[in-house]
């Protein structure tokens, strides 16, 4: 959420494993039913691109009791190395858990992520550890807020200038350039990240 008066942004992070009603679509993008499934599957249950983004936004809105959502911005993780390096790298402080991704990620050390290391930082999770997605979600918040802070340091219009070469390749959004640049003018309160109440449980084998 964005407070236009204080210029502060607060993040609501929703677990990809959240079980909810997912709309299903045929090959033309027309809705034909619903299933109870993980939130992350909504994109795949549509036809891709902007239509899948719209479907995901619609599902999230219903999950949040029809809370208004002003737009969507979807980034393919495959584009992280290029976008990251276009900014000259993104610096984050490492935790003890991050050493599992790369031994160079020492706890307490600030590391400027470059190339594939940036992608691995936001994508990695140990599939042998139950609920390892929680740690990945925490890293993703740290990374995205650091990326926006870096973009802001380059000037008011840096964020859109940064991503514009990658719009067709890695990004789907219904936001225009001015709206995207406005996002980089906010201070994001990473110590106040909200999430949905719930419990992560193992599914049936």
Residue ranges and their predicted role:
Residues 1-205:
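Non-catalytic, solvent-exposed segments at the cell envelope interface
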